[in-house]
């Protein structure tokens, strides 16, 4: 062989194989995780979701991740209460997203998504986290 696969991959001639959670986020791992806080109003979360063009957001309190909000939660809440935007996030948030480790396989990550679970958080090992969405998984398919 004239060129080995590692040399070709390093120079962009071969596609990287996406097999682990960190492979999915490597192109945007430097971006901060956008979160909402339980005591904030729902309107603040909506504003943040619009600003960053995201459809789901993890919710934190002083202890850590305690919930989540997505478009579906917001829509259902708005249908039943037109004043949803003025309520605290803790009153309408859903369950927290599962937290995975960097080495988790794509197959394992994919199994965590469901109608009720729109995202997964990945523990970066340095006290910070990142988010993986269904869109990220679909976008990683070559």
At which residue positions do the language-model features occur?
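Tandem CBS (Cystathionine beta-synthase) repeat/Bateman regulatory domains
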Residues: 1-142
